[in-house]
UniProtKB/Swiss-Prot annotation:
This is DNA polymerase delta subunit 2. Accessory component of both the DNA polymerase delta complex and the DNA polymerase zeta complex. As a component of the trimeric and tetrameric DNA polymerase delta complexes (Pol-delta3 and Pol-delta4, respectively), plays a role in high fidelity genome replication, including in lagging strand synthesis, and repair. Pol-delta3 and Pol-delta4 are characterized by the absence or the presence of POLD4. They exhibit differences in catalytic activity. Most notably, Pol-delta3 shows higher proofreading activity than Pol-delta4. The gene is POLD2. The keyword Iron does not apply. It is found in: Nucleus. It comes from Homo sapiens. InterPro entries: DNA_pol_a/d/e_bsu, DNA_pol_D_N, DNA_pol_delta/II_ssu, PolD2_C. GO terms for biological process: DNA biosynthetic process; DNA replication; DNA strand elongation involved in DNA replication; DNA-templated DNA replication; error-prone translesion synthesis. The modification Phosphoserine is found at S15, S257. Disulfide bonds: none annotated. Keywords: Acetylation, DNA damage, DNA excision, DNA repair, DNA replication, Nucleus, Phosphoprotein. One of its GO terms (cellular component) is nucleus. Changing L217W: Loss of POLD3-binding in a yeast two-hybrid assay.
Amino acid sequence: MFSEQAAQRAHTLLSPPSANNATFARVPVATYTNSSQPFRLGERSFSRQYAHIYATRLIQMRPFLENRAQQHWGSGVGVKKLCELQPEEKCCVVGTLFKAMPLQPSILREVSEEHNLLPQPPRSKYIHPDDELVLEDELQRIKLKGTIDVSKLVTGTVLAVFGSVRDDGKFLVEDYCFADLAPQKPAPPLDTDRFVLLVSGLGLGGGGGESLLGTQLLVDVVTGQLGDEGEQCSAAHVSRVILAGNLLSHSTQSRDSINKAKYLTKKTQAASVEAVKMLDEILLQLSASVPVDVMPGEFDPTNYTLPQQPLHPCMFPLATAYSTLQLVTNPYQATIDGVRFLGTSGQNVSDIFRYSSMEDHLEILEWTLRVRHISPTAPDTLGCYPFYKTDPFIFPECPHVYFCGNTPSFGSKIIRGPEDQTVLLVTVPDFSATQTACLVNLRSLACQPISFSGFGAEDDDLGGLGLGP
């Protein structure tokens, strides 16, 4: 792939100067379509209740699940609503899960005067053996028991369950299924290798010199300022860069100034100001050479709830001079040379990690694809806008590349769907912690990590640069 292309050319760094300097034209993007319009907010009204988004989600998902249930259990299976259930009668029910969790943080529990409880300490996971599942439809709810993995499932998941109502009033689940992968348009064949670079978690403003050096190495490689002719030729095959959130460090979110007297903070500025200036300079270097899509993340200066709206262009006076810079939403979807990308900055996957037993971020990514919903835990444990007409987080179409940013480590996997769908799953690691980005080959849907690290004290040769996969 990328490294193999670089190795095909002779090393030129130590060769005598030449009058004819090699020039490499960047591979053009034949077609590009930004398909993130469903995530753009027109009106911003927070006066509505969140019950509407659950009702809309169930209405939109019900046809997919009824069809999937008949494929899974046979066309003769009866699909009923909860109000139509009869004791001991086996049937299928479609509904939305609610997971009752004793350890789930609750502001009502914390402020309750009669309980006088101390706030719960933060946990990495909130699952407990006493967790229970409740299935809801438009009219009723019923507790579930039987063959169903309580610890793995989360609130907001729409699924179909097969079983019967028992004398204790609970629904005994014998089997269950999800909507599975959405239909997918095949990607057109490409005749040459071209790459999309995925980066997340630059963490600017954190004060780490190693991270800053790695970021500059990344910029220099992409723009062809680093390496010999082999590396520069390979860099010319990078057709687009996607920055998947957390461009600023968590340390820029300090709110200590709120608790200080005004005369102490009158001449100080927010820590994020210098970080945004630094980001503007980095985007200037990148967008002068290659198209760049910038997604916001948890620590970036935009709205906190999903879908996060694009960063404001006034923060980047230098980089916005180039039309190659695109400020996009989180989640973000686009079609690049016929390959459909869909990704988030990682909040959806991190939230499911906290409220389920799934440990692997790549497994969670695949699970959301099977459930056919980007963020089922929103709005219960993850903030989102109170939509009431449609739920934009439902997959209308299966992507070819599905990624999430700011994960602890790199991972990639190709999965197949029941209708020959092919999807590349990518977990993009936090760059400030790992100095690692990901390259996706649009022609083959292969993915490889590429690492950028500075010289350590133990490095005695150029091998310490750590540039490459």
